[in-house]
Amino acid sequence: MDEPRPEAANVDSQQNSQCCLTRSEVYALVREVINKRKHHNLVTNVCDHVFDDGFEEQLKYIRANIDKALITVGGEHKHCKRLAAHIKKINKIFKLNKSLETEYKQSIDRYGSNRFNRNN
């Protein structure tokens, strides 16, 4: 029987790792965006919190540059993960509800009111 080639295993693990984006990778992306914008003196709203309206500047920068965005992942066998495939997830992560009332209304719209009515 032929010995498995380590290169093939490494390629497979690289392909499989492209399909998920971790929270720490999203945090790393935001940190790098802020650092890059500061480096180029694009400091408008760079200190705004994710709940502030000014944070949209970071998201605009991410969307404009997502095709060039890479995250280096892995321990012993490091490789780069492209982030362009994850733009929908990134947009969803940062589309945050700022009030419980809004979140409740969106949950009702999504799942229906019967699910939240305990009297039934």
Swiss-Prot record:
Domain of life where this protein originates: Viruses
Transmembrane segments: none
Keyword set includes Nucleotide-binding: no
Any one Gene Ontology BP term: regulation of DNA-templated transcription
InterPro entries noted in UniProt: Baculo_LEF-11
Keyword Transcription applies: yes
Keywords, alphabetical: Transcription, Transcription regulation
Function recorded in the entry: Involved in late/very late gene activation.
Family: Belongs to the baculoviridae LEF-11 family.
Protein name: Late expression factor 11
Organism: Mamestra configurata nucleopolyhedrovirus
Gene coding for it: LEF-11
